[in-house]
């Protein structure tokens, strides 16, 4: 499946019910990855409102709280600025306890990494090796503030591997990918694992 679902695209109570059912049906194999959303063109393509980054991050934190409440409580209630649930029942519960591993995706240093420190089991960052080391240090500081054991959180690196036999082949592959995704070529060519065979 995809690396990370965008919180803005589904009501978090509904998404939690879907995730719980998938975990139950799969014998406890779901890993739940969610982020605040970032790609404005995708929002526009599917007719979703594209709130400011601050609003999307507040929505993500509320969604994380709903996910945890609905997977661990018989009847969950939550009153937030963006989402509300009242005695929401989530059955079947996920098989994994307390809930399927929670990936908090994104590398924003002030808020997203704080949310990872507070709620997440896994983090995933779209950076180079130096950026990975830097994000890890920031996460560690957030863990200290949250009184969270930093070593409990698994840190992962997201990168694209695109290798061409030669420059012409690489350019052709990049063009196909850009045509399909609409993501600018620079988002790929700035990564360390994009190039020609040597």
Name what the model sees in each region.
Residues 1-198:
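Active-site-adjacent structural elements that line small-molecule/cofactor binding pockets in enzymes
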């Amino acid at each position: 499946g995809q690396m990370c679902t965008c919180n803005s695209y589904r009501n978090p109570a509904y998404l939690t019910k879907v995730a719980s059912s998938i975990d139950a049906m799969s014998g406890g194999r779901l890993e739940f990855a969610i982020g605040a959303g970032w790609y404005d063109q995708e929002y526009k393509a599917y007719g979703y409102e594209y709130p400011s980054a601050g609003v999307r991050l507040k929505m993500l934190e509320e969604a994380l709280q709903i996910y945890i409440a609905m997977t661990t409580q018989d009847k969950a209630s939550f009153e937030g600025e963006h989402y509300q649930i009242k005695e929401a029942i989530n059955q079947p519960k996920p098989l994994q306890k307390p809930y399927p591993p929670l990936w908090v995706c994104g590398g924003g240093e002030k808020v997203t990494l704080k949310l990872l420190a507070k709620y997440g089991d896994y983090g995933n960052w779209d950076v180079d090796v130096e950026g990975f080391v830097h994000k890890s240090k920031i996460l560690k500081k957030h863990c200290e503030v949250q009184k969270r054991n930093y070593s409990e959180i698994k840190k992962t690196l997201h990168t694209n591997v695109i290798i061409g036999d030669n420059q012409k082949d690489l350019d052709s592959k990049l063009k196909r990918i850009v045509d399909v995704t609409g993501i600018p070529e620079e988002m790929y060519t700035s990564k360390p694992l994009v190039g020609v065979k040597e």
